[in-house]
Amino acid sequence: MNNPFKDMDCYEILQVNHDSDLQEIKANYRKLALQYHPDRNPGIEDYNEIFSQINAAYNILSNDDKRKWHEKDYLRNQYSVQIEDVLQHLQTIEKIPFESTSAFVERLRQDEKIAGSTDDLPTLGDTTWLWTYAKPIYQKWLRFSTKKSFEWEALYNEEEESDAATRRLMKRQNQRQIQYCIQRYNELVRDLIGKACDLDPRRKNVVKLSDGERYNSLQEASRKQSERDRRQYQETFKNQSIASWTIIDQEETSSDDESLSKEIVNSNPIMCMVCNKNFRSQNQLENHENSKKHKKNLRKMNQEIKKHAKEAQKNAESNKQPEDAPSESPYSNKVSSSDFYTRSFEEIEKTFTFVEISDNEFYTASEDGFLNEDDKLDQD
């Protein structure tokens, strides 16, 4: 009997896919082991070789580390772009047309989809696109971060080493190599995108606008946006149901009633004149009057009232005139100097108040308007 699994891969021997889980691998292994076990097929020497291949395939695929090492070539070959490809394209990008660079970026984009990236990386488009639309594409690509695992870049097969310390050292070296390859790949892709952006022919087709043209363009864009907002508002207003407006009116009415009632209550506050405080109800005022602070302010106010009353009585007694003092000055009505020169003598005379006094009183009067005896002699 010829060996049906000759020159086959582990996945082909166990008849599973590369994304099959351990349960599916075990199920297929048991089925094939029962079918090709030598004890079930005595006298057939080829079954020993077939069964050995089945066991070897199962041992590899059931162990994660062995499976990764076995899949190195498969993982690498499922991607169309490797580090050396990006480096080569970057070195020749100035000599090739833009269409070739755009096609190469599309290969990068497809590789990320295969790697399971959820980022929607855009294409570079063609030369007919406006730079206004192409510029955001480059901005997104310049933040590129690959989802490729680069596990095929591992240097050592850890499972082949029996010494634990050596195996740990191999694992650290493999992790460093994988991390370096990921970082190197990201940097090369970003450099490639940056170079492609600089060489993009669509940059040269940008029309430079003057300040006036730019202002007019912004004004036109603002006008169109306002028009779209206005139409959207009208459409929304048109689709409003009458019931919704009724509910709004009821809510506004109840809100107005509550505000009005609050204004009425607040328009007549209950006030404590001692503490200069407002209260909402009579109960609050009564509780306040029983407080220590109110009683303290009340005692203080009573003391001030008594103090002011005593001072007022004292001032009244000190300002009391003697009984023989004249009630008013003989010249109670004063005449200003300006009136003296502008009014007639008769008018000025009418403003005087004449008081009958004796000659003795006239000559002995004080200096507030009366002549003394020397002045009288001078007049004579």
From Swiss-Prot:
GO terms for molecular function: endoplasmic reticulum-autophagosome adaptor activity; nucleic acid binding; zinc ion binding. GO terms for cellular component: cytoplasm; endoplasmic reticulum; phagophore assembly site. A motif (FFAT) lies at residues 361-367. It comes from the Eukaryota. SMART domains: DnaJ, ZnF_U1. The keyword Cytoplasm does not apply. One of its GO terms (biological process) is meiotic cell cycle. This is ER-phagy receptor 1. It comes from Schizosaccharomyces pombe (strain 972 / ATCC 24843) (Fission yeast).
